[in-house]
Amino acid sequence: MKDLKDTCRIALIQAGPVMFDKDATIEKACKEIIEAGNNGAELIVFPESYIPCYPFGLTFGFTVGNRDKYGRLDWKVYYDNSVVVPSEDTDRLADAAAQAGAYVSIGITERALENATLYCTNLIFGPDGALLARHRKLKPTGAERLCWGDGNKGEFPVVDTPWGNIGALICWENYMPLARVALYEKGVTIYLAPNTNNNAEWHDTIKHIAIEGHCYVIHVNQNFHKDDYPKNFHCPHEYENLPERPCNGGSAVIDPYGHYLTKPVWDKDKIIYADLDMQQVPASRMEFDATGHYSRPDVLELVINEHDPVEDLIEFAEYDYGLEECDGICESCEEAAECEAYNCEG
């Protein structure tokens, strides 16, 4: 592990978006980024799918074997307000990160350029505004599969910072043991766990991750009210029976020993600040280092496939291998042996 800068000041943005309104939510997020930066935050972390929102409780009219035309209209609103990467939308976030002079991790619903699929995505920007990482959620959970596709590339990016490597897994990805180990293999010292999940067991999970990885775990959750849903929805019955506060926060920072550095904050919007003592990370690994001295790679091995099979096939098909037969002198062959191997007569 490289030498780590002693302290990292972080900010957790526990809040709700302007639901289903991309532009207004980006404007809100930019203000929150700049506020946190003005208060000294060097790393600013948002929840899962903050832009344009997490569609809590919605099915968009899908049932097995049937689709509702009005639910399709609501889905189209969600589609239209999702974020293309890169785009002017990400440029606005990048500018805010640069103005704050901070690393920014933010959850979005991404609209793919290559098709009409939506993804639950986490972006990390650098303090200069550069987009450093994009992670698409590997497997949407339950009914999330009605609106998000499986992540298909760049699944485990980490960002090298003065405080070590930062990486993110989204919500229930953190229940996937091999996904966690993939981040440990990449040397994460600050493990981001953005989500929209407030069940009681979740805090057991993030504490376990901190102990297992001997890293800081940053859990940041949304806080929003049922009244925040748009009033012009075509299927309002889908959210009318939700709890008054479907998602009520509970964001917290866990230290490398599994203890709360900041206790969970419930039922309110709040920017939560914490100063991470980064020297505790290597110190905590004295007796347990998950991918170091407490591992047995000769017995147990993790293989991470980070290649997109579709893109690999396209690249294979388009590559000019120079295997065409030619008449006369073959200009593409520099040595006679190559010509002979390619059945050329030049």
Which residues are covered by each model-predicted region?
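N-terminal glycine-/serine-/threonine-rich phosphate-binding loop
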Residues: 1-43
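Catalytic metal-binding/acid-base residues of hydrolase active sites
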Residues: 16, 50, 109-110, 175, ...
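Cys-nucleophile CN-hydrolase/nitrilase-fold catalytic domain and related Cys-dependent amidase chemistry
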Residues: 22, 34-127, 197-199, 203-213
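Structural detector of well-ordered beta-strand residues that form the stable sheet scaffold
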Residues: 105, 167, 216-218
